[in-house]
Amino acid sequence: MEVDSKKSSDVVTKLPQKRFYRQRAHSNPIADHSFQYPAHPDEYEWSQHYPDIGDRRVAFADIGCGYGGFLVTLGEIYPDKFAVGMEIRVKVSDYVMDRIDALRKLHEGQYRNVACIRTNAMKYLTNFFHKAQLEKMFFLYPDPHFKKAKHKWRIINSALLSEYSYVLRKGGLIYTVTDVRDLHEWMCKHIEQHPAFERLSEAEVEADILSEKLLDSSEEGKKVTRNKGDKFVAIFRRV
């Protein structure tokens, strides 16, 4: 996407630099953070994030969106769909918000379909989304919580899967990616055991337009690539 030279000379907007938004890799999802959230999805003013949303609803949710690389890619691939990133870390969510704001100024009329909200998706997901609202949910490189005592904090678990099945429409998809084999096996086991989901075949995964983007669009994915790490992908359908 090229920016008109005259227009770019008149605009001093620059993309934010991550080095000014550094924060620890993960945040405790059980801690008592201070969040603002609606009592019901109808009470949330989505227009504050999406100027053109009108009566439409968000279709994609990137849970733990990190620095927003994949979220921005979603906005480019699906210009007619609204995607939200949910991030618990304050500095990281600030970066994504500033990044989207800068992209909108640099590319007039674009990136108006993506936004980031600082919240705890493990606690407040159903406060933001109606039943059967979402078409896709993404869990890219989530915190592995290696210690067994902290496995209950993992973003994929039996209790939370019931909430995900509630906000996902029939035929909707859950995408998971991690560089930790143990976490990959954990997520697959729990999702496959849940009666509301079925795993896509390898052929279906390969045919999905987002499969390649899942691996390297996010900043974490690029880091894993640089370090020559493994990447484990699985996609599940809401039945």
From Swiss-Prot:
Major localisation: nucleus
Keyword Repressor: no
Pfam family, one: Methyltransf_4
Gene Ontology molecular function: tRNA (guanine(46)-N7)-methyltransferase activity; tRNA binding
Active site: 143
Gene Ontology annotations for the cellular component aspect, listed alphabetically: nucleus; tRNA methyltransferase complex
Location of this chain's protein in the cell: Nucleus
Catalysis: reaction(s): guanosine(46) in tRNA + S-adenosyl-L-methionine = N(7)-methylguanosine(46) in tRNA + S-adenosyl-L-homocysteine
Binding site for S-adenosyl-L-methionine: 64, 87-88, 120-121, 140, 218-220
Record-listed E.C. numbers: 2.1.1.33
Keywords, ordered alphabetically: Methyltransferase, Nucleus, RNA-binding, S-adenosyl-L-methionine, Transferase, tRNA processing, tRNA-binding
Keyword S-adenosyl-L-methionine among record annotations: yes
SUPFAM superfamilies named among the record's database cross-references: S-adenosyl-L-methionine-dependent methyltransferases
Function recorded in the entry: Catalyzes the formation of N(7)-methylguanine at position 46 (m7G46) in tRNA.
Family: Belongs to the class I-like SAM-binding methyltransferase superfamily. TrmB family.
HAMAP family: tRNA_methyltr_TrmB_euk
Protein name (Swiss-Prot/TrEMBL): tRNA (guanine-N(7)-)-methyltransferase
Originating organism: Culex quinquefasciatus (Southern house mosquito)
